[in-house]
Amino acid sequence: MSKNYHIAVLPGDGIGPEVMTQALKVLNAVRNRFAMRITTSHYDVGGAAIDNHGQPLPPATVEGCEQADAVLFGSVGGPKWEHLPPDQQPERGALLPLRKRFKLFSNLRPAKLYQGLEAFCPLRADIAANGFDILCVRELTGGIYFGQPKGREGSGQYEKAFDTEVYHRFEIERIARIAFESARKRRHKVTSIDKANVLQSSILWREIVNEIATEYPDVELAHMYIDNATMQLIKDPSQFDVLLCSNLFGDILSDECAMITGSMGMLPSASLNEQGFGLYEPAGGSAPDIAGKNIANPIAQILSLALLLRYSLDADDAACAIERAINRALEEGIRTGDLARGAAAVSTDEMGDIIARYVAEGV
């Protein structure tokens, strides 16, 4: 008998609800094809929760997430709520507390250039022609964003500001294992990013990554300085499989990886804790300017579902089925407006229907 799974669904604001609808169509196709027992419950979050409950992250939403095996998150935010104090706005008041509550220490951001979308890549045509499929694994809870001491002091010419880059052994060990385990499901290569020629924290990072690598003899390990990595991503992104990054370096490189794909509407992300519980969401924003027009690209949300199946439900076959369905749709020239460039475009609903059908048919 298959295991019972439960997913907390948080559609959010802007295009969130309409792209989430498409992901749930695909989930239904997965359930039927793979005989998976998956239930869902919907909860308000972000601006929708402010409107309905007076706060961006109501207790009922937190409780619903606690009872789930994973969270499928849409997007939050919009001009309607920008007048609120920063900690009460949808982004800071919902997403950051969820990450803290569930101790989500690792962020996974795939960046793939799909066949047929090379023209959207801002790199030279000969580089784009090689394609790329990169997974950026970023540590989320340590490093310079959280290290102490930090602050400002002094005045006049002696005024100064300071931050502290701090990493503990356990933080490096656990994010390194995420990267190596991910590489085992991909092309068996990890490139660890640091600045070990200057920073003590990076020296420790490199030492510990080397130690963890001995547990994965089937995975190739390379080290690269952050400044060189930013250049190599532009020069030849196809050389990379899994990028292992600290919080700061991952923040930079994951956005660079996203940019060279040419479309934020294609980029999912996952944030995981040590127990495998995860929050899965598109990398783009709520796009309130196109909300409700049935023109948003739902692929990032659907790919976020694929990540959920792979990392939290250990259903790699189902995740691969979704990815193959998306590949087929794109190979056939099926595009939403953001990718059409003057050609005929399908609606949000139509793209969801097509991908769900391809999953059901086992393309």
Curated annotation (Swiss-Prot):
One Gene Ontology CC term in the entry: cytosol
InterPro entries in UniProt: IsoCit/isopropylmalate_DH_CS (IPR019818), IsoPropMal-DH-like_dom (IPR024084), Isopropylmalate_DH (IPR004429)
Site for Important for catalysis, residues: 145, 195
Top EC category: oxidoreductase
One BP annotation, GO: L-leucine biosynthetic process
Binding residues for Mg(2+): 227, 251, 255
Location of the protein in the cell: Cytoplasm
Claim: Protein transport is one of the keywords in the record: no
GO molecular-function term, one example from the UniProt record: NAD binding
Binding site for substrate: 99, 109, 138, 227
Positions contributing to NAD(+) binding: 78-91, 285-297
EC number, UniProt record: 1.1.1.85
Needed cofactors: Mg(2+); Mn(2+)
Involved pathway(s): Amino-acid biosynthesis; L-leucine biosynthesis; L-leucine from 3-methyl-2-oxobutanoate: step 3/4
Reaction equation(s) it catalyzes: (2R,3S)-3-isopropylmalate + NAD(+) = 4-methyl-2-oxopentanoate + CO2 + NADH
SUPFAM superfamilies, alphabetized: Isocitrate/Isopropylmalate dehydrogenase-like
Principal subcellular localisation of the protein: cytoplasm
Cofactor binding annotation: Binds 1 Mg(2+) or Mn(2+) ion per subunit.
Keyword terms: Amino-acid biosynthesis, Branched-chain amino acid biosynthesis, Cytoplasm, Leucine biosynthesis, Magnesium, Manganese, Metal-binding, NAD, Oxidoreductase
Family indicated by similarity: Belongs to the isocitrate and isopropylmalate dehydrogenases family. LeuB type 1 subfamily.
Function text: Catalyzes the oxidation of 3-carboxy-2-hydroxy-4-methylpentanoate (3-isopropylmalate) to 3-carboxy-4-methyl-2-oxopentanoate. The product decarboxylates to 4-methyl-2 oxopentanoate.
Subunit structure, interactors included: Homodimer.
Name recorded for this polypeptide: 3-isopropylmalate dehydrogenase
Species name: Shigella sonnei (strain Ss046)
Encoding gene, per UniProt annotation: leuB
